[in-house]
Every structure is written in C-alpha cells, then in structure tokens.
C-alpha cells in the first residue's frame, strides 16, 4: 500500500509499504480521510519532536524512523480480528490515536493522557492515517454513527478542544476569550457554543480567521494589531474580564495577554504546544490569583464529541477548506499551510 512516511526534518516521502495484518483484538481500517495537524507541521519544520529518529527507537512503540504520519483520520472497517463481534464490515469509524502504558502513576490514577510514556499513532509509530490502511486495537476504535468520514477526520482535534474546555471547568453562561483562531482555537469556539458558554471573544490578527471565528459562533472578534485585546474584553464583559481565556497561539505575549484579559480569579488554559520554553511575568498572575491550567490531548472525549455531532449540536464541515490526494501532500498540504495566507483551516488528505 501507499503511505506518507517521515524520514526526518523536511523529509516526507510517499512510499510503497506492506499492508498491516489484522491480529486478535484489532481492527483493520480503510482510511478515507486524514487531516494535517499543526503537530505534523512542527515535525516537518523542527522535528523530530514526537517522532523517533533512525537511531533511537520510541520507548512506547519500539519503532524508529521512518514512520507513517497522520493521527486525525476516519474510514471504514475493512477487516476484523476473529474475536471482535461489535463492529461491522464497512462501518464508519474513527480512532483515538493515543498509546499509553497503563502502568505509570498518571495511568493508574486514570489520567491516561498524561502517561509518562505516551505515544501517538501517526507520530511515534503504530501506523498512521496517511496510509491506505491501518490496524489498531479495538479499544481505540469509535463508531461514527451518522457522522461522515470527512467530519470524522476532525473528531481527534475536536476531542482536543472538548478536553481543553473541560479543563477550564467553565460554568454555563460564563464568558470566554479565545486567543488564536487556528484549527484548535476555532474548534474550541464551536465546543464552547455547543456546551452553553456565554459571551465568546476571539483575538486573532488574520481577517480571514476572524470571519471564520464569527461563523463558528464567536460573539466578538478583536484584531490585536489595532486594539488592546485585554481592554476590549473588559469592555465586553462589564469591566471584569473574561471568566476563562484559552491560549491557542503558542506565543509568550499572547499568554501574557490571556492573563491580562481574565477577571480576578479567572482561568487561563494553555492549549498551544510550544517548540521552545515560554516566559511569563508572574506578577499579574499572582496579583489577580489567576489559575493557569495545562491541557494535553483528551481523556474520554471522543465519544461525547461523536454524540454532539450526531445530535446536531456540533458542525465541522465549514472548517474543511481543502481536499487533496496523497501525492499532493507536501506541496498542496504542508507547504500550502506553511506558505499560505492563513485562510486554510483544515486540509484533508485522501490516501
């Protein structure tokens, strides 16, 4: 079968590799669509970060580079392990691509997303969604119900957004500010709207992405190049500031802006993954008793997201801005996202 494999920084190749073989307890999936994630871009530009090197195997998978990329994907059941009877051939499914050890202290406490040895399918090994087929453990497979496989390819980033909103512990009707209207920021807006948040402000310098934020359900958009975001957010919240702010840009000044934008004893959720250590003036955080919260991946969020999609409370089709074939992955996918205007949100790839 054909697959996109990461060989090293700036080196992704479309290659012929053997089809994976079904084992007991596993499911073989024919991949329909796979999204390109910001993490994939980080690997391409700055990696290897989460991918293994040719010399050093990943501690969870034992695999070395090259590895198949792609962790945001959906498709149909192509083959079932002999012991699996709760899925059907041709059924639309998606995958939670997180591999965990189940024996470290975070895992034993039920916080599998913070596993000491965690790995991600499509980065660390175990196959990936940028291939025609993948075989995964049954426990990682979720039926989509009436959700299409195109929308299903966005369930993984939706689960990230859903988990981030859950980490905020935001009360119904509470105000929120989202800094950065990239794919995850826009999906956080969508989840906030679907789960009953109050006034939602989005801070984003790109005019195109500000428009998309309004389409996603934001009540106000702010251009930080034109006005001070924290002052405008206080105006929009009766002078208090937002109950919670989500940092989705990965920029130090934006993290400081989130602290400035929330009310006293408000919450800042750091969503972005940074390539370099962050710096933050702690005095404003201390004086306002701001709660700074981290969030990573998801923990039991895939099924709630699928339920929201099937109930019509979430819609993601508007975020799919382009569809390409596997042969166009580097130029039409990775380079387009790196060199483009920022108007592309989610590019889907058909392997």
Where are these regions (language model features)?
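Mid-domain Rossmann-like dinucleotide-binding core that forms the NAD(H)/NADP(H) cofactor-binding site
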Residues: 139, 146-226, 231
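Residues in the short beta-alpha loop(s) of Rossmann-like NAD(P)-binding domains
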Residues: 47, 206, 274, 298
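Glycine-rich cofactor phosphate-binding loops and adjacent beta1-alpha1 units
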Residues: 168, 211-291, 332, 343
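NAD(P)H dinucleotide-binding glycine-rich loop of Rossmann-like/cofactor-binding domains
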Residues: 57-71, 99-179
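Glycine-rich beta-strand-centered segment in the early N-terminal region that forms part
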Residues: 20-34, 49-105, 140, 145-147
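C-terminal hydrophobic helical "lid"/dimerization subdomain
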Residues: 256-260, 299-351
């Amino acid at each position: 079968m054909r697959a996109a494999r990461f060989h090293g920084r700036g080196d992704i190749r479309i290659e012929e590799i053997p089809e994976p073989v079904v084992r007991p307890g596993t499911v073989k999936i024919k991949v329909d669509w796979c999204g390109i994630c910001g993490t994939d871009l980080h690997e391409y530009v700055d990696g290897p970060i989460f991918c293994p090197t040719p010399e050093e195997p990943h501690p969870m998978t034992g695999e070395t580079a090259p590895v198949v990329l792609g962790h945001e994907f959906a498709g149909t059941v192509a083959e079932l392990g002999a012991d699996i009877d709760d899925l059907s051939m041709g059924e639309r499914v998606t995958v939670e691509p997180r591999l965990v050890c189940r024996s470290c202290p975070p895992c034993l406490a039920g916080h599998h997303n913070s596993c000491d040895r965690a790995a991600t399918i499509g980065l660390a090994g175990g196959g990936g969604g940028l291939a025609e087929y993948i075989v995964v453990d049954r426990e990682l497979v979720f039926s989509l119900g009436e959700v299409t496989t195109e929308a299903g390819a966005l369930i993984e980033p939706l689960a990230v957004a859903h988990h981030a909103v859950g980490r905020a512990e935001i009360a119904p009707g509470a105000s929120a500010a989202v800094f950065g209207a990239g794919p995850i920021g826009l999906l956080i807006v969508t989840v906030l709207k679907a789960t009953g948040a109050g006034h939602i402000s989005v801070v984003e310098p790109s005019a195109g992405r500000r428009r998309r934020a309004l389409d996603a359900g934001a009540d106000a958009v702010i251009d930080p190049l034109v006005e001070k975001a924290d002052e405008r957010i206080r105006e929009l919240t009766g002078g208090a500031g937002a109950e919670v702010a989500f940092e989705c840009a990965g920029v130090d000044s934006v993290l400081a802006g989130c602290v400035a934008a929330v009310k006293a004893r408000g919450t800042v959720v750091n969503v972005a993954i940074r390539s370099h250590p962050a710096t933050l003036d702690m005095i404003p955080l201390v004086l306002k008793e701001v709660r700074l919260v981290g969030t990573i991946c998801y923990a039991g969020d895939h099924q709630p997201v699928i339920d929201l999609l099937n109930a019509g409370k979430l819609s993601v089709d508007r975020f799919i801005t382009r569809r390409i074939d596997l042969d166009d992955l580097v130029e039409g996918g990775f380079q387009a996202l790196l060199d483009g205007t920022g108007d592309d949100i989610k590019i889907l790839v058909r392997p």
